[in-house]
Amino acid sequence: SGFIVTTEVFRCREVIESYAPAQRNFHDQITQHLRRLEQATGKAFGDPANPLLLSVRSGASISQPGMMDTLLDVGNNLEITAGVAARTGNAWFAWDNYRRFLQNYGMAHDMSRDDFDAVIAEFKNRLGIPLKRHFSGDQMREVALAYRRLIEEAGVEVIDSPFEQLLLAIRRVLASWESPRAQAYRRIMGISDDWGTAIAIQAMVYGNRSPQAGTGVIFTHNPRWAGDVLKLWGDFTTANQGEDVVSGLVNTMPISLFQQEIEMRETDVTLETHFPEIYQELKRWAHTLIDDHGWSPQEIEFTFEGASAADLYMLQTRDMAIRESQKVLAFDFEEPPIARLLGHGIGVSGGAMSGRLVFTLDEIKAWRAREPETRLILVRTDTVPDDIREINAADGLLTARGGLTSHAAV
């Protein structure tokens, strides 16, 4: 459930910001749509006893994955978080939501993801806990409060009013159209700067609610193989929210047994085996979109709050990016083979590549000038939208985290 702020708001944003009657009209329309959303969900925006939290994300006519801001868990504050903890009996879940909101909020104010990663890494090291899902509720509360202090120490005011948060989130998403990374992406992809973006405002659903909840992305067709056979392929993870998967920040698990076998994944967990109802419902929806409605192959982002089909939610869908095949001489077969296997991972585009490892844009430029024929492979722990220039300049990408449905991969 949700509503759309159209591109007309983007085009008229200066008038809305500067002309009081236009601003009041816009606020009134947002309030009206919030009331309808409250009726549809049975929750109340800003009510600590039964809060409606929102996701606020861009929606341009041509997808620009990860280039513009997304704010999740909007409408949250300390009082509401305490209310969620009391209502659900799950303090970890409540404080994880607030932690995520604060990180999105800080990054929308130009703070670095690395700053927040350093905070949670320090907690993990000090407590001897390798994964955040193993924190207690009180420990997650301390992490969230540390995030808030980090933001305030950076000179950024944390707004507690849910409605003011929503208005700020809308402004930030609109402004992110002009961000350097979004402009760079549009130049690379040949997208006009004049189109602007709409905004999708949706009720939050929670893949981080429990170990039986999760989130993921599926392709309706194998992205590596030609043909139009409908076969689900993609990534999912449990006890996380959607941005974790598409941002490439977590290690993911395969959708099907067939995918697990083909990719030689070192996990026994697949969506098909561990969440069969979710898998079958996704398959049913894929057949409905492709076979019944004649859509092109789709990339579908989903979240499930439990193991039954009724717990599944579709967050968004878009046409799959179809990659062109290209023959590349990857290896010199006259050279002796490598003595031992150094590691293996998940291939995204199929085939193979060899080349020189690089780590920065300056390094890429230097090797392009020195050896223009040498293929360059960018190495990252994970990828974030600000890496778009490096990714575009390199020939290949190797990351320690993330899956084939992350923004960098697609």
Feature map (PLM): residue ranges:
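Nucleotide/phosphate-binding sheet-loop regions of phosphoryl- and nucleotidyl-transfer enzymes
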Residues: 1-350, 354, 365-377, 381-389, ...
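Hydrophobic, helix-rich cores of sensory/ligand-binding and other regulatory modules
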Residues: 360-363
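N-terminal glycine-rich flavin-associated loop
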Residues: 357
